Amino acid sequence: MSDDPSTNDALGTLRAAIKQAVTDVRGQTPLAQSFTNFVTINLVANAQLAAGGTAAMSYLPDDVIATAEIAGSNYINVGTLLPFFKNALPEIARKLHENGKTWVLDPVAAGIGETRTAILESFRDVPPTIVRGNASEIIALDAMWGLADADSTTPATRPAGVEAVDEVDAAVDAAKRLARHLAKRSPVGAGAVAVSGAVDLVTDGERTFRLPGGSAMMTKITGAGCSLGGVTATYLAVAEPLVAALAASLLYDRASEIAEVKSDGPGSFQVALLDALWNVTADQVAASDIIETN
């Protein structure tokens, strides 16, 4: 924490914006459309509803593009792929970009497989507004897009499926570079990157925040990160990217802590998590620990 009054004032303003985002989602029930993986689609939709939003799930390019016209934001997750996705996802990303639509990307298992790599590489010039992933995915995406200077690239350990094998601290520089790249091409003139881990990180490329808290039980259910991406899109429908990424991450930290106390294992934890997403207050989210770092 900083003793600089200007820093404290800025953090206070940010907390107020986070509280407003949580309040607005529950008051406006914004639609966030998801093109997400088959394994976690149910949890993604239910989490968006529990957070206060509205969900729509689709895979056909013309359907996604049409729904994007009425959606507040969109979410693309590359966790499970079919052959036609190799052409469909780049087309969807290009149309979202051309139409000035905001969207969240979860680059699940970035660096594994030629098809996934080709899809993620195609997003470089028509990028999302927010990227949310684990440290290994963020480092891999930064490398794919060639954003680092040759002498400053932090090599990623080979991804272990959808699980991170890199620590969040190793992804700080990559996250900042990605966020600045997103901002340059964003329809709202800003972008953000959220890195999930033991202590989450969120950055817009200029300001960087660490978010202590959350529950290790999140790693014991499938779809925790995927559903967080969906809820991030829900918040992006009502807030600017940095606030949306922070609000969603903090909501999940608080909800997962509550769910862990109320559950006996992974099955009951998932149910308790949805209940907690519904019940956590805007004040609780905004009052969470937020540490601004360099």
UniProtKB/Swiss-Prot annotation:
One of its GO terms (biological process) is thiamine diphosphate biosynthetic process. ATP binds at R132, S196. Its EC number is 2.7.1.50. InterPro entries: Hyethyz_kinase, Ribokinase-like. Its cofactor is Mg(2+). Keywords: ATP-binding, Kinase, Magnesium, Metal-binding, Nucleotide-binding, Thiamine biosynthesis, Transferase. Catalyzes the phosphorylation of the hydroxyl group of 4-methyl-5-beta-hydroxyethylthiazole (THZ). Belongs to the Thz kinase family. This is Hydroxyethylthiazole kinase. It comes from Bifidobacterium adolescentis (strain ATCC 15703 / DSM 20083 / NCTC 11814 / E194a). The gene is thiM.
